[in-house]
Amino acid sequence: MSKGQSLQDPYLNILRKERVPVSIFLVNGIKLQGQIESFDQFVILLKNTVSQMVYKHAISTVVPSRTIRIPSPDQPEDDAE
């Protein structure tokens, strides 16, 4: 995993696993809302009434509806609770 992905992937994975509602703001100002269904290196699948594939290069900000605790790199995600 590249250094740039070391925070992004665990953060998105926690949001996905805990089904945290998120607001995603795109670079053009559009606000999308839903839950992260899955993601990869290039896209996020956002589910609300429909599923939307959102390209990461179009995303400005991801705002969770509640505070998220990100485990440290040497701490497994399951131990973070």
From Swiss-Prot:
Lineage top rank: taxon: Bacteria
Family named by the database record: Belongs to the Hfq family.
GO cellular component: cytosol
HAMAP family membership: Hfq (MF_00436)
Function of the molecule: RNA chaperone that binds small regulatory RNA (sRNAs) and mRNAs to facilitate mRNA translational regulation in response to envelope stress, environmental stress and changes in metabolite concentrations. Also binds with high specificity to tRNAs.
Gene3D superfamilies: 2.30.30.100
Gene name of the encoded protein: hfq
Record's protein name: RNA-binding protein Hfq
Entry keyword RNA-binding: yes
PANTHER family found in the cross-reference section: RNA-BINDING PROTEIN HFQ
MF GO annotations: RNA binding
Lineage start: Bacteria, Pseudomonadati, Pseudomonadota, Gammaproteobacteria, Oceanospirillales
GO biological process: regulation of DNA-templated transcription; regulation of RNA stability; regulation of translation, ncRNA-mediated
Residue ranges of domain Sm in the record: 9-68
Quaternary structure and interacting proteins, as annotated: Homohexamer.
Alphabetically ordered keywords of this record: RNA-binding, Stress response
